[in-house]
Every structure is written in C-alpha cells, then in structure tokens.
C-alpha cells in the first residue's frame, strides 16, 4: 500500500439548483466508494422512475434518504479519491441542519467547493439578494474555511452551449463578491464544468477548447490544472493543531461495568494520553486519565481529529456530561465561561433580535440557552467596520458585536485561541437564525473545584 493518502474534508456549497448534488454525485460515482452493484441498482431505479437524466443526483438522494432515516450508511459512500487525497464530503447543503452541522462541525472543512449555475438567468437567481450563493460563501468564510474552489456548472446549458463569454462574465462577478467577503481570488481555481455530462470533471473537455485551464498563486506554492479533480488535488492539507493545549468536547459519557466512567469525544486541539491529569469545564472536576481507546484499541496518545473514549478515575457520570470540555490541568486548563463577546451574523430571523433575547446556542457539543445581554455595536458584515454603537436591535442580514451570558454553566473559547470551540449557531424556531464567532471570554477563576485523589497525588 505504501503511505496512506492524506484525509481532507470538503463542503459543497451553492444555490439550491446549482447542481451541487449532480456534481458531488458524479465525483463519488467516478472516483468513489460506491460499489458497482449499488450504482447499477440506483441506475435501474432511476430509469424506472423516469429519472435517468438525474442519475448522479439520484445516487446522492438515495444516500441522503438513508442518512436521514438514520440508517448509518457506509460512510465510504461519501468519500472519493484524488491522486493525493482521500476526500470526505462533510455535507452538502439542502439538509435542514446543514448550517448547524457546518458550525458545530464534527469536522472542519479544509476547502469549500462553491458550485454556481451558468445557465441563462440561473446564475443571477443564485447570486441575487435572496439567493444562497453569497450566504453559503459568507458562512464558509465566517467559519474559517480558508480555501475555496469555484465550479462553474451547467456550461452545457449556456447560450450558445459552452460559451466562453458567459464563463468570463460569471467569474468576474464571482471574483468581485468573494473578494468582498474576504477571499483572495488569486488563490481560487475557477473551473467551467458540466456535472451531468462530465466536462472538465475528471478529464479536460473537448467542448471547451478555449479554456486554457485554471492557475492559482499562493504562498504555499502555485498550482495549475484543467479539471475539477485536479483542483481538488491541489488543496493545501490541514496542519493538525497538536502543539496547542488539549481541548476535547465530550459527546457522551458512559458508565461501563468493571471499568468505570468513560467520556467520549473528538480531540480538537492538543493530545490526550494515559497518566495525564485533566480538568473538565465548566464543572471544574480534575482527575487522572487511566487509558485512551480508539476503535477498541488502546492508544499511547490521541491527536486532533481522533474520536476517542477514555477512562477516568473516581469521577461519576453525574459529574460530567455532553458539552463538558476536557483539558490538561497543567496547560491552560479550560474554565467555565461567565460571559463572552461575539460577532454574530443574523441570517434568517423573521423578526429582530434585541437585548434579552435568549435562544439556544450550539457550540461544539454544548447545547445551551444564552442571553443576548447587550448589543454593543452593529458592524458591516463584509469589512467588520463599526456602523453604529449600541444598536437597539439586529435583523436579518445584520452583523453585530454582542455580549452573551449562558443561562447554565458552559465552556467556550475565543475563536483565535481554539477555533472549534469559538464558533456557534443560534437556533430558534427549529432553524439556524444566526451564526457567531467568539471574540473574547470572561472566565471563572476556577477555584474550589473537585480534585480526585489520584489527580492530587500527581500535582
């Protein structure tokens, strides 16, 4: 086998009819984990239902339906390979909880693939004031997705088909709006494709001989190519934050007979290993780690990205819970957040948000109501510059700096210190009404917590 390929995560974004599903389906279909038998079964069903023209999207729809019914489908189905990487598609929007998932993200996307439809009138609809193209791109930027690829889809339905003029017109427009959001167009490949016919997806298309290819300039090295697959192959792989202090938000806490208390979660930053003395916030409980396991094998050390279970001494299941954060007691231990300041972008709130509003925040694995105690300023969401001091309220489309107070103990961090613990979704009326990035946190001083005997010995 040789060295395993690097794993990267992508998120596919764009307006509802841009052809995200077809494009994604095509990649999975041609380079991915779906076995031929499953594909043939899907194709036959698609034909029978008169959806033959829709086969790639159909593949994706089948996968989505199974995923939504809670059938844990083989996650390999959402993976495909490039020459250098194993690529996992974290999620494609269209899912009601897409935004929430992207924020509380079980995994941070390394790159966003923005799909725009080039058909006459379609591009304009997606990029208009209420189109999702800008919203998704802004979201990706706000949540720290640093890299982007733009796939100009449906080139087969421009007038005339495969029109160079239309492609140029569209990339000029896209460059202008992504620049406003904060992306540098020089670092972004723009690829004209047909997700359905396969033009420029895996092989250069004969239909667009005018297209000389994409090229990008960036400090990590320049790159160029012709196809979407090559653009994906040029993503800069993520640096794992092993050098940061430990942060591990708990997904669950189990009580296992004969072993004891086993918290489970994903290491976001730092490392965790047996013998380490850890502190759980906001409960302020300190104890020793006995063992660390992943996939039923014990590990000498777990790193960022690893989903692990670990056994702790003399801590009851009542002491800690989902949403608690495990940290190294000797290296910037996590503490309870008394209040925090955040920049929020209001997205689809039907009314307006004023001081006193108390919705539920989803931040890492925590799910806790927080009160908007004070609206400090209204800012221009593109530049971050202040527009107004102490606004009375914020409505859809506004961005502001706000002071939030949790209604129950909570542990969050500033985005610049620990990114995965510093972004949140504001949920109300069963939808995401705002997203936020935490600027600063007022922490409890952390005195008077519970310390187990084994932890005290090691102090």
Swiss-Prot record:
Domain called tr-type G: residue spans: 5-242
Subcellular location: Cytoplasm
G4: annotated segments: 153-156
Annotated segments matching region G1: 14-21
Annotated transmembrane regions: none
Chain segments carrying region G5: 194-196
CDD domains according to UniProt: EF1_alpha, EF1_alpha_II, EF1_alpha_III
Residues covered by region (G3): 91-94
Keywords: Cytoplasm, Elongation factor, GTP-binding, Nucleotide-binding, Phosphoprotein, Protein biosynthesis
InterPro entries to which the protein is assigned, alphabetical: EFTu-like_2 (IPR004161), G_TR_CS (IPR031157), GTP-eEF1A_C (IPR054696), P-loop_NTPase (IPR027417), T_Tr_GTP-bd_dom (IPR000795), TRAFAC_GTPase_members (IPR050100), Transl_B-barrel_sf (IPR009000), Transl_elong_EF1A/Init_IF2_C (IPR009001)
GO molecular function: GTP binding; GTPase activity; translation elongation factor activity
Keyword match Transmembrane helix: no
Pfam families to which the protein is assigned, alphabetical: GTP-eEF1A_C, GTP_EFTU, GTP_EFTU_D2
Chain residue ranges for the region called G2: 70-74
Biological role stated in the UniProt entry: This protein promotes the GTP-dependent binding of aminoacyl-tRNA to the A-site of ribosomes during protein biosynthesis.
Name by which UniProt lists this protein: Elongation factor 1-alpha 1
Classification lineage: Eukaryota, Metazoa, Ecdysozoa, Nematoda, Chromadorea
Primary gene name: eft-1
